[in-house]
Amino acid sequence: MPTVEKDGQEFESSLERDLMSLLRFDTDVDTFVSQPVKIEYQGKEGVLCTYTPDIIIYHRKDIASARKKPTILGEVKYKDDLCQNFREYHPKFRAAMRYAKERGWIFKVFTDVHIRTPYLKNARFLLPYLNKSYEHCTIQSVIERIEELRETNPHELLASFYLDKWNQAMLLPVVWHLIARRSIGTNLQQPLTMSSRIWRMYYE
């Protein structure tokens, strides 16, 4: 049975839950919906069958980085399951590809290989900081300091403000917030630590 999360989105597996964490962290994503459509297709010997993809993902139209990204109709599968049962899934996926193409979307299968990476761990860590509010003057001070330093790491950035650990700890959530908001850049494909290289992000 599907499980309901706090925001009402449903998921049937922990892998779907992990994908939803990535989508919530993706600033190009507008909304996503679980089990969005039921697709009819002909199975063996012309028998009418139905298939319900796991998710549909809509991208934002108000920012340049997302404007040209297509809507994605998606299925979530473990790679081993996909390999072992591909013959069973193939007619369903073919129907979904056709359904998506007719609407100008794309159909995509997400596997654990693509989902469960260091990026996921970073996304899950940073998500609680994404929409938190901090004083504008504090945010501006951190941004201006990292612009001065050009490239640094969280440890060095905090040390440039305070020598004592208490004040550094008080400021650290602001750094995580700015990384989550992509105001500060870093390589999120690698584990995020206090020694990770960080820099100011600029957008056109």
What are the residue ranges of the model-derived segments?
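Electrostatic, structured charged patches in enzyme active sites and in nucleic-acid/phosphate-binding
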Residues: 1-204
